Each structure stands twice: as structure tokens, then as C-alpha cells.
Amino acid sequence: MPYAHITGWGKCIPPASISNDEISKIVDTTDEWITSRTGIKSRRVSHVSTAELATVAAKHAIACAGIDAKDIDLVILATCTPSTMVANTASLVQKNIGAVGAAAMDTNAACSGFLYALQAATAQIQAGMIKKAVVIAAERMTWYVNWSRRDSAVLFGDGAGAVVLEAADTPAGLLATKTGCDSTDRDILHIENFGSDLNKYEPIGPSNLLFEGREIFKRAVKGMSEACDDVLAQANLSLDDINVLVPHQANLRIIQAIQHRLKVPDEKVMVNIGQYGNTSAATIAIALCEAVEQGLIKPHSNIMSAAFGAGLTWAASYIKWGERVTPISVSDAQLPPCDKTGLELVAPAVKACKEAEPT
């Protein structure tokens, strides 16, 4: 059976940001309130589409792998903020990167999306159906934000990350995984005012990202920790064998609680939520790239990753890194210049959200 090695990695971080102090100009909050409850200090706001974020991240990953985009067999995009529903956003990314003829599909498992997509692409390689895939997670979560609601306005950001998978004979890549969904209480985390169930001929107003924070905290910590235990058992490993933990970056308190429950020391945990906020499916993809860039991931590292999202979806994965931690080549792909600040980018949405609030 072939294995699916990660041979390339890349990210796309929008240049415009909104700090906690700037958020306090929009909703009633403070830097101390946000930081103490979430660990977030800043978040990015994209001036371009989800497809453009995904394209730049994918181009960096492809260059890093040193392959020709025309040799890619599958483009899979994890997102809950697609640029278009029909046709899917992955098809536009496929066109943009020049992966001529490659299969292209979107997948939506909310914050668990990247690990779901990684599993799907890995399975196709292991089955001998394809040889090369690019797996992308890209989100414009600020598009969903109701800027009159403090609870969600402070949490989310935009960004994208990607990896290239290639068939190989030696054991590396995604070697064990556990995915699932507890739909019993799916309504504790959802977006209202969005989807084809709505009557589009009636005024809809801003979308609302609704969640029960305390309940989600408990379920996220329990679900991700238990999934990690299951994956370790699958792989016949102990926590001492794990070199790096790359958790979903939803909330620093959740990360610390999982870390405590699994007894993983600080130096083994990748954390970047402070500068990006929660980018949903993209958090793990971006964190994985930065863990390599920062030297946290080394050749042959054993990596554990876990996520929890709306649905309520969850996933945990054991990834064995390969030999290489440096790019074969570098892409010059970049976003077009942004001539606005983060606050200026969201100003029209802020105005609309506040006007829609009941008086």
C-alpha cells in the first residue's frame, strides 16, 4: 500500500488586521477581556475572496514540493466560506493554479475540515486512485461575523493553508486518524440566516454565528482528547512518542485544557491563535506550516493534530513527517495590494449589522 507523504506546505495570510483595541471601537469590549478569555490579540481580515486565499496558499505548497501543478490529480478545498456554491470553489482554485484536468471538490466539516480533507485525499492515494493531491483549507470567517455581537466579533479571522501529498513507499504522512460527528446537539454551534432553507424573497439581515461557549468548551476538550487517545491506540504509540501537538486554534483556554489533559509540555504545542484568531478549517493548515517554519517540526517528527467544529464534527490525526523540512522551490505568488486597514475593510458590514439591530 502506498503512503501519502506531505512534500509541500504553504499559507496565505491577509495583510490587514484588527487588534483588540480596534475591536473595542466596534463592540463593547477591551483587550484584557478578549485576551483573558480567548488568548486572541489580533485577527486578519481579507480583502480578497476565499478562492484567492486558497490559490496563493496552494501555489506556495506546490513550489515547496517542487512539482508541476499539471501533475496534480486532486484539488480538495476545506471551507465553510466558499466563494461560490455552484460551481464549487475548488474548481476555480484548480483553474488558478494550473492543475489541468485534476478532480476538484469542496468539503465542509467546519473547523474539522482540514483533517477531514487530509483523510479523504490520503485514502485516495492509499487506494492507488491518485498519486498527487493538494489539500487546502481557506476561510473568510469575517464574512459571517455579526459585528454588533461581541461574542463572535472578537473570535474569528481569515486565512488559508495548504499541503501537497505524494504517493511514496515508506511510512509517512497521515498514518492514523479518527473522525466523527455528534449531531445530537448540533444547534449549540451554528450559523443562522444562511442557506437554502431560508426564503430568499424576504429580508434576511446579517448572519449570526451562534454558540453556547461553556458547552462547546467542555465538548471540545473531551472530544478532541478522547479522539487523540483513540488515534494513539491505532498507531500503537504513547504520548511520549509525540513530538508536536498541532491543535485547532479556536481558543487558548481550550488548547491549554487539552494540553493539560494529555500532559503535553508547552514546548511541544504549536500555538498561533494570538495573531490570527479562529480561522476555522484553516487553523491547523496554517499552524502546520508555521510549525515547520519555526523548527518545531523536524525530520521524522511524530505529530498529533485534533479539531472540533460545528456539526458537531471532530477529528484527530497522527502524522509522520518526512525527511525534508525545507522548500525545494519558492513561489512568488502573493495577494494584490490592500490599500485599506482592517477597520476600513469591515466598516460597511459594521454599519449594516448595527442598523439591523432591534432598537
Curated annotation (Swiss-Prot):
- Please give the InterPro entries that the UniProt record associates with this protein: ACP_syn_III_C, ACP_syn_III_N, FabH, Thiolase-like
Q: Where is this region: ACP-binding?
A: 249-253
> Where is it localised?
Cytoplasm
- EC number(s) per UniProt? 2.3.1.180
State the superkingdom.
Bacteria
Q: What class of enzyme is it?
A: transferase
* Reaction catalysis annotation: malonyl-[ACP] + acetyl-CoA + H(+) = 3-oxobutanoyl-[ACP] + CO2 + CoA
> What processes in GO biological process is this protein linked to?
fatty acid biosynthetic process
Gene Ontology molecular function, alphabetical: 3-oxoacyl-[acyl-carrier-protein] synthase activity; beta-ketoacyl-acyl-carrier-protein synthase III activity
Q: Which GO terms describe its cellular component?
A: cytoplasm
**What pathway does the UniProt record associate with this protein?**
Lipid metabolism; fatty acid biosynthesis
Mind telling me which residue stretches traverse the membrane in this protein? none
Cite the SUPFAM superfamilies for this sequence.
Answer: Thiolase-like
Q: Which Gene3D superfamilies match?
A: 3.40.47.10
| Keywords carried by this UniProt record | Acyltransferase, Cytoplasm, Fatty acid biosynthesis, Fatty acid metabolism, Lipid biosynthesis, Lipid metabolism, Multifunctional enzyme, Transferase
Q: Summarize the protein's role.
A: Catalyzes the condensation reaction of fatty acid synthesis by the addition to an acyl acceptor of two carbons from malonyl-ACP. Catalyzes the first condensation reaction which initiates fatty acid synthesis and may therefore play a role in governing the total rate of fatty acid production. Possesses both acetoacetyl-ACP synthase and acetyl transacylase activities. Its substrate specificity determines the biosynthesis of branched-chain and/or straight-chain of fatty acids.
The family annotation for this protein states:
Belongs to the thiolase-like superfamily. FabH family.
Q: What is known of its domains?
A: The last Arg residue of the ACP-binding site is essential for the weak association between ACP/AcpP and FabH.
Quaternary structure per UniProt? Homodimer.
Protein name, per record: Beta-ketoacyl-[acyl-carrier-protein] synthase III
Q: Which organism is it from?
A: Pseudoalteromonas translucida (strain TAC 125)
Q: What is the lineage of its organism?
A: Bacteria, Pseudomonadati, Pseudomonadota, Gammaproteobacteria, Alteromonadales
- Tell me the gene name: fabH
